[in-house]
Regions:
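Short polybasic amphipathic segments
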Residues: 152, 169-183
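Contiguous beta-strand/loop segments that form the cofactor/metal-binding neighborhood of enzyme cores
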Residues: 88-169, 199-208
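Beta-strand-loop-alpha-helix segment that lines the small-molecule cofactor/substrate pocket
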Residues: 1-29, 44
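Active-site loop of classical SDR/Rossmann-like NAD(P)-dependent oxidoreductases
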Residues: 189-200
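NAD(P)-dependent dehydrogenases' Rossmann-like dinucleotide-binding region
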Residues: 22-29, 43-64, 78, 82-86, ...
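Alpha-helical elements of Rossmann-like donor-binding domains used by nucleotide-donor carbohydrate transfer enzymes
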Residues: 9, 32-39, 89, 120-122, ...
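Short glycine/proline- and charge-enriched loop/turn segments
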Residues: 66-74, 179-184
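C-terminal helix-rich "cap/oligomerization" subdomain common to oxidoreductases
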Residues: 6-11, 20, 201-242
Length: 242
């Protein structure tokens, strides 16, 4: 889905057939650290969430990419592609049902020969419950031992949580690093063993026609906001004109 018109068609089809349209937002549903962060917030460890900062850097791995990867009309743009994951997390952690795109930008700063590739993007958004900043890119250097140093910082009124999802550049081994800071402590948690309930819940939803894995309205809202951010984005660098 790369346009709002396509999203409208999906919504109409789901409504007509009673189908479930669900997306595996893997930066939430496949990351145990995110599950643990949600538990910490539910425990009141950082107060009320008022902002998220989501960073989604990726490695380009140019030799592995098909031709369509460098054609904006086919892949939909970097905000539709990667930033949708961060929008999902913003809505989820702030408890927002809707949001406004304050500003968005896409750019090609490092690949001037591929004018259809957006290698950088950012979004500022806000809702009645909080604000969010998102940065995504295709700049992960080869020296990093994984495809991207994905991070999420969740700011609350009484503290904050930082997730280093796939690597800790400070030297801790493994993945799913959680840091919690509040009025009582500055704590490190290895969240590798936290649950990943999305797929089990989705199967339950398919069988019982429920919405435990992810509300349908939430899924469609993430798609809508990503598509709107993409459509209104300021274009910088060596991007082809549209």
């Amino acid at each position: 889905c790369t346009t709002l018109e396509q999203l409208d068609s999906i919504k109409a089809c789901a409504a007509e057939n009673g189908s479930i349209w669900s997306i595996d937002f893997s930066e939430r549903f496949e990351v145990p650290a995110v599950t643990r962060a949600a538990e910490l917030i539910a425990e009141g460890r950082i107060g009320k969430v008022v902002q998220t900062v989501g960073l989604g850097p990726h490695r380009l791995n140019r030799p592995t990419r098909p031709d369509w990867f460098f054609n904006e009309a086919e892949y939909g743009g970097i905000l539709t592609d990667i930033a949708s994951h961060q929008i999902d997390q913003f809505l989820f952690f702030t408890g927002s049902n809707d949001a406004e795109i304050i500003s968005s930008t896409v750019a090609n700063f490092a690949n001037p020969s591929d004018t259809g590739l957006q290698d950088f993007g950012e979004i500022n958004l806000r809702s009645d419950h909080g604000l969010g900043y998102i940065r995504v890119d295709w700049y992960t250097p080869d020296g990093l031992p994984t495809w991207g140093d994905g991070r999420l910082t969740i700011l609350g009124t009484e503290g904050y949580i930082e997730l280093r999802k796939y690597v800790d550049v400070a030297g801790r081994e493994g993945t799913n690093h959680v840091f919690v800071v509040n009025g009582d402590s500055c704590e490190y948690i290895n969240a590798t063993d936290a649950a990943l309930p999305y797929f089990e819940e989705l199967i339950h939803d398919v069988i019982h026609r429920t919405e435990t894995a992810m509300p349908q309205k939430h899924c469609f809202k993430v798609m809508e906001l990503a598509l709107k951010a993409q459509a209104q984005a300021v274009r910088l660098g060596a991007l082809s004109k549209v």
